[in-house]
A protein has these predicted regions:
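AAA+ P-loop NTPase nucleotide-binding core of proteostasis motors
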Residues: 1-215
Length: 215
């Protein structure tokens, strides 16, 4: 069943069920649950994914685990892509399929196929900052219109997808955050400042939220 049809009592206890399994990231969990609740309440545009979230923080603080637990508690699948495997220009073809006449045309696109097969899921794109810049054009399309057309003209529908992208962009700077500004810059603010340097404004502007994870 789509998350929009989840009964309210299950959603009401969602925060606590996630916190039971994730320690020390209460603020991050709150933001994620809030995004799901907004989708449930019909407060988002029908032609967009349920949520488009960027998780930032150092390695090993639970970014991927929150996505896993969220999917499990919502009773939907987790579809994961490691974006460090999509660093080359031709990586776009892997996600949406190669053009006619090219090797791999018959294979279709890995992302479009996955969403057509599992249209109701948490889509996790790990280490998004490593993806080739052309892949961001695909993501803008997904965040804007909740659909993607593959190489054969078939559409994948992202309206019941919670899109979560993880990044450790800025984590290394955050540890130096107390330098300067008389120590007033929080590590979270330092990470968010680095996010602005790492990602294009049109990408950041389309996110439902940027969620900071602390170590």
């Amino acid at each position: 069943a789509a998350i929009k049809d989840e009964d309210n009592s299950a959603l009401a206890s969602l925060r606590q069920r996630i916190l039971d399994k994730i320690y020390g990231q209460d603020t991050a969990v709150d933001k994620v649950v809030e995004a799901v609740m907004m989708a449930k309440a019909g407060l988002i545009d029908d032609d967009k994914p349920m949520a488009s979230l960027l998780f930032v923080g150092p390695t090993g603080v639970g970014k991927t685990e929150v996505a896993r637990v969220l999917a499990r508690e919502l009773g939907i699948e987790l579809v994961r892509f490691d974006m460090s495997e999509y660093t080359e220009k031709h990586a776009v073809a892997k996600l949406i399929g190669s053009p006619a006449g090219y090797v791999g045309y018959e294979d279709g696109g890995q992302l479009t196929d996955a969403i057509r097969k599992t249209p109701n899921c948490v889509l996790l794109l790990d280490e998004i900052e490593k993806a080739h810049s052309d892949i961001y054009n695909i993501l803008l399309q997904v965040m804007d219109y909740a659909r993607l057309t593959d190489n054969k003209g078939q559409k994948a529908d992202f309206r019941n997808v919670i899109l979560i992208m993880t990044s450790d962009a800025g984590a290394q700077y955050a540890s130096q955050a107390n330098i300067g500004f008389a120590g007033n810059v929080s590590r979270g603010q330092a990470m968010l400042a680095q996010v602005k340097k790492t990602f294009r404004p049109e990408f950041i502007n389309r996110l439902s939220d940027t969620v900071v994870f602390h170590d």
